[in-house]
């Protein structure tokens, strides 16, 4: 059984993330969405909220599970007994960053492989950062996120 991890902060999960997850779910036996605590980032949603939103957004995918983690991704991968990391690439900037990370992952966890997927064209510009910024400033992000996330964002930014 090929078990892979798709890691990220997912603050919030977007339709671009969901596109990558859905396509990876068709390629691998089991996908674990690793939701990173990312304490150095100022997140809109808590780790627990992000895990819940990812779970709700992927509930229709039977071979996808979600787990929060803190610390190194390679340690999480080792704990989950996964040796493949799925990463999304939108631009050449993403590629350069991910290429560096991949080299580090291989040093820290020999045998780990990274698989890169590009999003569907309509999501190539989309990022959680953009969604957060637009939402915080009163913009409508409904078309960019799953319905449960849209509802959660509206509630969160109304406070």
UniProtKB/Swiss-Prot annotation:
GO molecular function, one term: ATP binding
Keyword Ligase found: no
Listed pathway(s): Cofactor biosynthesis; coenzyme A biosynthesis; CoA from (R)-pantothenate: step 4/5
Key words of the record: ATP-binding, Coenzyme A biosynthesis, Cytoplasm, Magnesium, Nucleotide-binding, Nucleotidyltransferase, Transferase
Amino acids binding substrate: 9, 41, 73, 87
Record localization: Cytoplasm
Positions annotated to bind ATP: 9-10, 17, 88-90, 98, 123-129
Keyword Acetylation found: no
Cellular component, GO annotation: cytoplasm
NCBIfam families in the cross-refs: coaD_prev_kdtB, cyt_tran_rel
Biological role: Reversibly transfers an adenylyl group from ATP to 4'-phosphopantetheine, yielding dephospho-CoA (dPCoA) and pyrophosphate.
Subunit: Homohexamer.
Protein name: Phosphopantetheine adenylyltransferase
Gene: coaD
């Amino acid at each position: 059984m090929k078990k892979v991890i798709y890691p990220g902060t997912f603050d919030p999960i977007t339709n671009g993330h969901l596109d990558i997850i859905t396509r990876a779910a068709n390629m691998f036996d089991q996908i674990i969405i690793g939701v990173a605590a990312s304490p150095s980032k100022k997140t809109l949603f808590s780790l627990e909220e992000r895990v819940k939103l990812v779970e709700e957004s992927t509930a229709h995918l039977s071979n996808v599970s979600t787990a929060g983690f803190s610390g190194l991704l390679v340690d999480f991968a080792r704990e989950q007994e996964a040796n493949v990391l799925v990463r999304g690439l939108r631009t050449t900037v993403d590629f350069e960053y991910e290429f560096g990370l991949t080299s580090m992952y291989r040093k820290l966890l020999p045998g780990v492989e990274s698989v890169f997927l590009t999003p569907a064209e309509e999501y190539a510009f989309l990022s959680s950062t953009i969604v957060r910024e637009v939402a915080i400033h009163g913009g409508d992000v409904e078309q960019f996120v799953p319905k449960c996330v849209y509802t959660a964002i509206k509630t969160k930014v109304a406070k």
